[in-house]
Amino acid sequence: MAVSKESTIFPVGTIFVDRGNYLTGDSVILFYQVVRCTERTVWYLQNRAQVVAYDSAALRKDLVPIADTYNPKAKPHMARILREKTFHCVKSPTGDVMLPWDGQPVSQYYGY
């Protein structure tokens, strides 16, 4: 069996953003951070979950990942790296496509 080589497609520390919903109907913004990446697979941990209210004009402007929010007992998610025409992406635990975070504060109109 071939051993997968480490890759820099998504370097360790890369942040992904995803949006989800709780059963109560509240929206939540999730930040995931890459902990390992090979040629075909990426492992990432959730490092922030922030409930947001869409009845407000916009989300909090300081909604960015918090690097020191880390649960040592958390198990990383594993996802296959998907290749679209000109870029790579991964799927979130809920099955939505995630792209790397662009470094801008997340707003109500953030493009996922």
Show the residue positions of the predicted features:
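Mixed-charge, low-complexity intrinsically disordered regions
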Residues: 1-31, 41-112
